[in-house]
Amino acid sequence: VDKQIGSGAYKLTLVSESITPWENDLVSHDATAKEYIVINSTPGGLKKAITAANKDYTKIKNLKITGEINAKDFYFMRDSMDILQALNLKDVRIIGTNEHVNDGWSDCINKDDQIPHFAFNGTGRQGKKSLNYLVLPDRLKSIGTRAFFGCEYLSGSLTIPEGVTEIQQGAFTACKSLTGSLSLPSTLVYIGNDDQSNHEDIDYSCGTFAGCGFVGELNIPEGVKEIRGYAFDNCKGFYGNLKLPNNLEKLGERSFFLCKNLTGSLSIPQKIKIIPNECFNGCGFDGTLTLPNGITSIGNSAFGDCHFKGELSLPKDLRIINNYVFYNNDFSGELKLPKNISVIGEKAFAYNWRLMGTLEFPEGIQSIGAGAFAHCRSLEGLIFPESLENIRWESSWSEDGGAFQGCYGINSIVCKGDLPAYVQTGAFEGVAKDNFTLEVPESAISQYQAAPGWCDFKRIAAHHELVCRPSVACALSTEHKQKLVINAEGEWEVASKPDWCEVSPASGNKKTEVTLTIKGMAKNADSRDGKVVFRLKDKDYTHECSVSQYGYEYGEDEWITLQKATKG
């Protein structure tokens, strides 16, 4: 390459050339060239065709097949070609036998253009150990049950050809040496069997790609409708965002269990109604979780031990929150529970320490499981409905067995039931029971004072309706105005306030919108805080709004120019 004097243009001159035949240049195609023995076969006649070519099938390592073959030929390769390493099926056509095959677990029929069931997986689920390289047929519609199950030395990347609509249970289970990329065709509809009569209890040992070593992004085609149980279980090499197809209708148990390098946000498609047990447990998601309103059930540990952030919006039709569903995530903000919830399982929200505000349990809820909100230390208040029957504690879980164990931030509890719910011994372990008043119906004060669990609270008094939302206001040095909403059962008034705050109006009746004004202060002055106390008239019942103001060298909403430049 020479730069021309004057014009500055570049001139390219070819000084030499070297052309290497593709089959000899192993660098350019990742050393995939093989010295194949090429056999043209007829269905069921592979052994005969190899013999006719004067080849010893027991000594063949690299085999390319053309023509047509059937299940009998696959089982011959599986059971008799002991050192077969590389198999190229690119130009072959597979003819179905329409015969039932059964290995004691599954009963299947081999069809046209389908890699036969158990093709390289024999008795006792032993995969073919010698096989390490595979090219699938261009003309292919299906990969049968456990076709390559346990072929643990099958290596490199895997490309499923266009035209394939299903990859059945166990097709590539435990192919741990597949450490390249996985490419799925746009025609794919089912990952796992689409036969509804095929019970899912076999999925636990036959996830389609379970235990594979793929490394790269996982791109699931938009046409996929079903991902069966354990499909990508323990596929720890997949990384990046996971986009589930909009057409997806069904997910199986542990579909993506322990795919710990999947990150970003996750959106569950609208057609999904049930998220089964451990579906995404142990994944590395660090963005937000979006759940459609049509979901009615979320199974045990479905999203446990992920790292989701942001607010959690639960589906409005959700009825049961099972054990460990959102355990050990990083959700924040106020949690709104759907009105139809009846049970919250063990450790369902444990260790989501950024959940905050007042948590109100809907009427109809009956049980709150052991450790359900353990160590949600930013929760400030609880409101329990009349329907609540029990709040549980598991003594063998020393640090997180109580439903609200370690929730140190709780400073308000309201119980609406005339009959106290049964509270097990350590349900509120760590909650400061002498720092606030437990509010209960006036007619039930004596029952709560004598009830197990509730009697540990030092102050129990009648509950009245008086609340301010929001109950926290913060400002910088400049004057700050903020709207508050007062909900009261009757007339209310401002009982006290800091002299640097104003509330207008200062009294009202039932629901009222007021303006809180925090007056300006000198820049860099000491910070200050206080409480605005609202009181029901004629009752010794109050509610507080915490206010704080921070001295700062700049005012709120003030534009700051740190540096100016006119050039460069």
Feature map (PLM): residue ranges:
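Structural signature of tandem-repeat unit edges
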Residues: E35-S41, K61-I69, L84-E99, D103-D113, ...
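Beta-strand-rich extracellular modules
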Residues: T13-I19, K519-M521, R535-K539
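A short beta-strand micro-motif common to beta-rich folds, especially ectodomain repeats
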Residues: G8-L12, D526-D538
